[in-house]
Amino acid sequence: MTRNSQNEPQPTIRTAGTSDTSNIARIYVDSWNTGFVGLMPARQLTDELCARWERDITVPFPHRWWVAEADAALVGFVGIRPSRDPIDPALGELDTIAVAPTCWHRGIGRALLAVALSYLRADGYRQAVLWTLAHYEQGQRFYEAAGWQLDGGVRDAGRQVRYRHDLRG
């Protein structure tokens, strides 16, 4: 196992499977409730949420999901898909990325994002988009540090903003 600049173990990233569903749902809820405090209502870990994640991660290609493991535990996940935006069907989309809050700032999100972008490129997309909350500053800093730029897209009465990433460079 390699280590990052803070001497933290780097995660192992692998394709997500149905056995990961409950951990993906837990990470989703934990990261939502920690990251979106004051921005969105808290979420609860429910059977319905686990079932939703099982449906999402078993959708066939071109939807893809990966998980990150560190210290023998699932600590994050990421998914890609064709863009749901009607602006351009040739766009890829970063569907969701989440890391367990206890593992933030350890490079796990960057590692997951690198895998997602690599596969979007390999799938032939020249650009990708993502949506995030307009006032989610921590997430926006993360995306901007990775080369994403606001492109002016808004939805949900301005509560969400769209970022775009050029995959050609």
Identify what each model region corresponds to:
Residues 3, 11, 15-21, 25-102, ...:
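Acetyl-CoA-dependent GNAT
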Residues 130-139, 156-159:
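Conserved beta-strand-loop-alpha-helix junction that forms the acyl-donor binding cleft
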